[in-house]
Amino acid sequence: MAQSTEILPNGLQLLQDDRFFKLGQDSVLLSAFAKPRRNAKLLDLGCGTGALALLVWRPDLKITGLELQDGPLDLFRQSIAANELENVTALQGDLRQMRTLLPHGSMDYVICNPPYFDRNAGANAPTAEKRTARQDATCSVEELAVAASFVLHTGGKAAFVFRPERLWVLLEALSRVRLVPKRIRFVHQSVQAAPSVVMVECRKGGSAEGLVVEPPLIVESDEYFRIYGIEH
């Protein structure tokens, strides 16, 4: 078990462990894509070690990170303590039992970096913790959407990062629970490359009209380096 500390672009410390998925590009980019309003109550759904919750952190937000597994959640709690964050809470629970965890309509914004891959797709991750984070064996995309919709009030928003080849799976699941896509942005490794990541922000309730497809984000562009806080 090798632990390390990552300094995030916003200056916060993230404790990591080789047993669990470490900070990746997708969480960093989603944290920049998500636009919670001022003083919002925000839920990181399936937060793991808390990377996304810490990346999106602002002093005005009230953040809850929900995680099923003991190990990642313990690291998240250590990161909260190391950063002395009074507006961040780590909550253990199964998102499939959301009705027993958080009140209906209690959140303004949900963020989620979910398992990308179908449980039957490709090789398994090397540890049970990484399999849970990588593949939808513990919860499905549909169950994630149901959980997000339950905790959001009407007009609340949720932001997801996903694989483009499974985008329809996500959009279909969202539509079933009144989560209407309002912003979509694709991430490309180069100008010539097909997208490798897609980010979707949806709103609970309202018209299906008004979807905005934002300009693509190119890896290692000036904007990309700004997100990482790197002078280029």
Language-model segments: which ranges?
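SAM/dcSAM-binding transferase cores
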Residues: 192-232
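Class I SAM-dependent transferase core
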Residues: 1-36
